[in-house]
Amino acid sequence: MGLAQQCARPMVVHNKIIEKELEAVEGTQYVTKESILRRAQEIKGIPLRDVDKTGRLATGKGAIGTVIEESWFGYTPNSESEPDFSEAGVELKVTPYLRGKNGIRAKERLVCNIINYMEEYDKTFQTSAFWHKCNTMLLMSYEHLADKPKGDFRIDEAILFSFPDEDLAIIEHDWKTIMEKVRAGRAHELSEGDTLYLAACTKGANASSVRQQPFSELPAKQRAYSLKSSYMTQILNKYIFGNAESPRIIKSADVLHTKTFEEYISEKVKPYYGMTQNELKLRLGVDSNAKSLNEILLARMLDVKGRIACTEEFQKAGIIPKTIRVQSNGKIKESMSFPTFDFIALSKEETWEESELYNYLAPTKFMFVIFQERGDGAYVFDRVMFWNIPNDDLEEVHRVWERTVQTIRRGVQLIQTPRGISNDLPKQTESPVAHVRPHGQDASDKLPLPDGRMMTKQCFWLNNTYIAEQIKEVR
């Protein structure tokens, strides 16, 4: 590197210059959006160990954000209702991302502020604590590298972010959905999967962190407003990395002033109810037999090319389409599978709410594409249904997860039988909601157990009988 290049970004190279910069901002107030953004962009590329003046990096979760607040901007972090830069109305949020074979994705949800059930229910969206604190955010991103110490991490971009109109309409609906449960005395039933972009995630030292709610004597889990990791993934890709936009279902935010996103989808596909898959292909001009055919058909119904799962709204909300074929007797043949799990990684998961299964299932809204069997044996498009797992049922999945983890830690029993090898992982007969079994037919596709033995890949499933009941309940 030549001298001119070295001098172009002296803060990255010379620690003394960095220290001088840090001293200069001690006690400084940033009162305009422009000055805040300018200061934020000056940190880009600097190892965080060279920023940290207080030793915060040695502490737990949230340390990186605290380091930037204290050591870079020179103010004491607060967890109050005001934005971090109250004069400018800007909230500072540091968001990590992961780089993988499928591109960039957010490492986690973006937690905003604690929901005070006793106060928030009496507000409008525009006067809510969420909107007051987070309507404009300074988003600072960094790549999380599992094999590197935090001191090596570097902020790579900083932007001022305000919600685009098309997102804001959905976020306002999400806020209203959360408040409807609080006003109905059901804050204890809140779930991340209730909503699309803005969620009420659990927030506390442990599962016993609870708060009073206004219309019920039952304590409710402490929760915070948060932006789902699926939403943050799209924000990072669009606004930080400038990646190409995905096709949108909602062409104008005005559409969502009178109906919810789910209502809009249901209305658009209703004219196609009662048609077989082949009839839909002819009607919509689709010449495909791909595994994702039903997703393609739904996208066409909504005037979108490609798969519905690849639309901007479905990606932001993390909505997963699932085709369900209901037999004429009301039964469903197939249970609903989740991704296969790694036995060793699963055995090391310490808490349910930090587990891979919880963070897949709890915040996810599914769109069931339901085909009903007619008397002649043909299956016709019956309806779409947006669904997320109720809290009580999520607790039953928790129990199945707990027993699975304990069984793997103790040592799975593999028993040779005339029909093959059986095991003592939770079976469908043991729970009304979930079970564990192999995902595919290939018994030779195996992964190592913690004790070194090899075992056919397994995954969690929601029981077919459970899904049938969930569909039946809302008809």
Where are these regions (language model features)?
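Nucleic-acid endonuclease domains
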Residues: 2-475
